[in-house]
Regions:
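Short secondary-structure junctions
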Residues: 1, 71-75, 158-163
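Non-cytosolic head/periplasmic domains of membrane-anchored proteins
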Residues: 40-125
Length: 222
């Protein structure tokens, strides 16, 4: 047992268990003020959640070497800057649920992960790595979108950090008061394999339309 804390939020004690032999074996146990057992989070060990979080963290650290680099030619220093990488790993029940619409088809199945297994993070990145990039730029155009997307692909290729797809938003910089206008280009799940110069602007225009249709569908479902 690593530590016990008291939560004023729920009025309970939480004991945090750290396994000395399992990198995915950490969990917590909750007790009432009278010492009665309430619940535990051991399911996160058994269902692959802990393993997924470990892999996600390792991939995030890889992508951060580029996206948090002070030398990045795009502003990543503002409080509203959004640039990160993630692995798309989800429970099978969510992947199979027809009412869940925000899980990409290329997602890895959390239930299939092996406890404590040392995975090749770059290999997983090539299968399910997802970049989320919000870029501030004075010019909002399909041509600028293509140029910047090619630039990011080049940076990740040179660093040998694979990804499968990117979400990309091109928007105007905010004012000194932190305000922004509504003009932007927004693309969801643009595949790495489609980021090449020949015909890129055409593919981007199609992706813009598909992304707009996706959000329109979500609005209709509200």
């Amino acid at each position: 047992m690593e530590r016990i804390t008291y939560s004023f939020k729920d009025g309970r004690y939480h004991a945090f268990m750290v396994s000395p032999t399992s990198i995915d074996g950490d969990f917590s146990v909750c007790f009432s003020m009278l010492g009665e057992y309430c619940y535990d989070t051991y399911d996160s060990v058994l269902d692959g959640w802990n393993t997924a979080q470990r892999l996600e963290s390792e991939y995030r650290k890889l992508t951060d070497t580029i996206l948090n680099d002070p030398a990045l030619p795009y502003d990543n220093t503002q409080v509203y800057s959004i640039m990160f990488g993630e692995l798309e790993i989800h429970p099978k029940e969510f992947i199979d649920d027809p009412n869940v619409h925000d899980i990409p088809e290329y997602s890895l199945v959390q239930d299939n992960l092996e406890l404590n297994k040392i995975y090749d993070i770059k290999e997983l990145g090539a299968q399910a790595g997802h970049l989320i990039l919000y870029v501030d730029n004075e010019v909002i155009s399909v041509e600028e979108t293509a140029r910047i997307m090619l630039d990011f692909r080049s940076m990740f290729d040179e660093a040998d950090i694979p990804f499968y797809a990117m979400d990309f938003v091109l928007r105007h910089p905010r004012t000194e008061e932190g305000q922004s206008d509504d003009e932007e280009i927004r693309i969801n799940d643009f595949l790495y394999q489609d980021i090449y110069e020949d015909g890129l602007t055409d593919r981007i225009e199609i992706a813009i339309e598909e992304t707009a249709a996706y959000y329109a569908m979500l609005d209709q479902m509200k």
